[in-house]
UniProtKB/Swiss-Prot annotation:
Ca(2+) 2 binds at residues 23, 82, 84, 89. It comes from Dictyostelium discoideum. Keywords: Calcium, Cytoplasm, Membrane, Metal-binding, Repeat. This is Copine-A. GO terms for molecular function: actin filament binding; calcium-dependent phospholipid binding; metal ion binding. Its cofactor is Ca(2+).
Length: 600
């Protein structure tokens, strides 16, 4: 049964007090995770906050957004973990209903955190607020001058900024933003501050906002410099400047003026577009599938193999192909899907290849629809000599060449590479380098882990906690999502939802960076008088064939197209250069020149 649209969206902000210290030589590095109980009684992850270093009283700036449904009892579980580089230690958890938060004065609850043995592990305060979505983003810069000197040595100050907004019902403030530290300056510049208008002020232009400035210290408590209060409407006024006031100094010194000044520059509100607007405007989504052909999967003829074709149901590879493919393919203008293998030896070859066509035909990498991908996989996996090792970089570089073709305002495309694998990668450095270099392209990478292997390194590739770096260069955007199939066995809909959860955010980050706007929705096709009706869910089977190739588009089959290089015009298929009237496509593995994406 489909869920009703949410009554509204609610933002949860979390802070903790005196949590257990799990670290021996320092303090815990806490992170909060929030889960909601689904209709099957299982807790489903809604979101995570950032990790705060060395803090037993963390106030998380990352909000957790949840759909509020009036007609349901929504049970929430809050977990706090101490997050180290390669491990997470459970600190404590607490549960309550969303209604219990919303019905409290100030929409605020205080919960006791408990360990797994039921012992006290600290406390947690949760504040809820309804989100009024205006689809607007506010941007501004802050320029500080003559801040108070706080350090005896050096330049005298290492300032950073905290922005908080007022909660009217409780007359308190919640932290929404924290800047990087500006090292060694009394004249800090906080540039490129950007957030949704709802996040800054809840959509209320008169909502009070607090700007606090602190001097960062390596050891001990950070020193308070001062603060000023304003609202979004004032921020947008030209030539705004504020005194940074330290109330303690103001009370003690009769001639006190300020602890510095801050002026506002380039404050603007920009319209924010949503994912659906781009899709409705004709943006082409493309899927590329990569299949692990390493020996660790087991001989495909062995019933214990991950590649075994089981008459009783789909194996995990086929399950991933169907779950994700059936969601993405409806957004494509053609059903053609490139499919590649890696870590195997093709028939007639002696060398391992880390990016080869699963069709086993170098001039034809395309399959028609999800069924065509399945047919190709089942027909050819037994013909490939499973080998190894597991390398991702060649496959990612191929997808990057594919994604780099023909992007423009009028011809928008976005590529999703789905890699299905059973084990750890052995070219981590090269893979990270390929991901970093691809992070500026219209590309997302989904990694689905099958089987019971240790997938620790995969979580490193998923840059949720920290941006990937290679050779001193940071990734422009997070483009990787990893999901372990074993967590979603027999739940294909939930698998697809989790695998694709980050795609809209990754998609929008690219479009926003390069200032691509949604195109107007194309007009509906003309109605031809006397023509038979066209259904999106036909109940009878008809045979549709391509006029040039004779392909039965209702059957899962490989597309018999020749590959030739075309330079004249980009194609609606997202870089494959497909001309269905001529039956030719670009060979995306050879000689493709990159397109420079310039910010307009």
């Amino acid at each position: 049964m489909n869920l009703k649209p949410p009554t509204s969206k609610v933002e949860l902000r979390i802070k903790c007090h005196k949590i257990l210290d799990k670290d021996t030589l320092s303090k815990s590095d806490p992170r909060a995770s929030v889960y909601e109980k689904d209709r099957a009684g299982q807790f489903r992850l809604i979101g995570k906050t950032e990790t705060i270093q060395n803090q037993l009283n963390p106030e998380f700036k990352t909000p957790i957004v949840i759909d509020y449904r009036f007609e349901e009892i929504q049970v929430l579980k809050f977990e706090i973990h101490d997050v180290d580089k390669n491990d997470e230690d459970f600190i404590g958890d607490a549960s309550c209903t969303l209604t219990s938060i919303l019905s409290k004065p100030g929409q605020t609850v205080c919960l006791q955190l408990l360990t797994k043995s039921g012992k006290h592990a600290g406390s947690m305060t949760v504040i809820a607020e309804e989100i009024k979505n205006t689809l607007q983003t506010i941007k501004f810069n802050l320029i500080g001058k003559k801040f108070d000197k706080k350090d005896l040595f050096g330049a005298g100050c290492d300032p950073y900024l905290i922005i908080s907004r007022k909660v009217p019902s409780t007359n308190t403030f919640v932290k929404i933003y924290e800047s990087q530290v500006q090292k060694g300056t009394l004249n800090p510049v906080f540039s490129g501050i950007e957030m949704k208008l709802e996040e800054l002020c809840g959509g209320d232009m008169q909502r009070e906002i607090k700007f606090e400035f602190y001097d960062w210290d390596r050891i001990g408590k950070h020193d308070y410099i001062g603060e000023f209060h304003t609202n979004a409407q004032e921020l947008l006024q030209p030539n705004q400047a504020f005194n940074v006031i330290n109330s303690h100094k103001q009370e003690k010194k009769s001639g006190y003026k300020n602890s510095g000044t801050v002026s506002v520059s380039d404050a603007v509100i920009e319209r924010e577009y949503n994912f659906l607007e781009y899709i409705m405007g004709g943006c082409q989504m493309n899927l590329i599938v990569g299949i692990d052909c390493t020996a660790s999967n087991g001989d495909s003829n062995d019933p214990n193999s991950l590649h075994y074709k089981n008459a009783q149901g789909l194996n995990q590879y086929a399950n991933a192909i169907c779950s994700v493919g059936n969601v993405i393919v409806p957004y494509t203008t053609t059903p053609l899907i490139p499919v590649y293998g890696f870590g195997g030896i093709m028939p007639g070859q002696s060398e391992v290849s880390h990016c080869f066509p699963m069709t086993l035909n170098a001039s034809n990498t395309l399959c028609c629809g999800v069924n065509g991908v399945l047919d190709c996989y089942y027909d050819n996996i037994s013909k490939i000599q499973l080998h190894g090792p597991t390398y991702f970089a060649p496959l990612i570089n191929m997808a990057a060449r594919y994604a780099s073709q023909g992007q423009s305002q009028s011809n928008q495309k976005y590529t999703i590479l789905m890699i299905i694998t059973d084990g750890e990668i052995l070219d981590a450095d090269n893979t990270i380098d390929a991901i970093v270099k691809s992070s500026g392209l219209p590309l997302s990478i989904i990694i689905v882990g099958v089987g019971n292997a240790n997938f620790t390194n995969m979580n490193i590739l998923d840059g949720d906690d920290a941006a990937l770096q290679s050779g001193g260069v940071r990734a422009e955007r997070d483009i990787v999502q990893f999901v372990a199939m074993r967590d979603y066995l027999n739940r294909p809909n939930e698998l697809a939802a989790e695998v694709l959860r980050e795609i809209p955010t990754q998609f929008l980050s690219f479009m926003k960076k390069y200032k691509f706007r949604p195109n107007p929705p194309p007009p509906p096709p003309p109605v031809i008088i006397g023509a038979p009706p066209q259904y999106d869910n036909p109940t009878t089977t008809t045979t549709a064939t391509s006029p040039s190739t004779g392909i039965d588009l209702n059957k899962g089959s490989n597309v018999g197209l020749n590959l030739t290089k075309t330079e004249s015009s980009p194609s609606p298929s997202g870089g494959a250069g497909i001309d269905l009237n001529k039956g030719s496509v670009v060979d995306i593995t050879k000689g493709v020149s990159n397109v420079s994406l310039e910010k307009n």
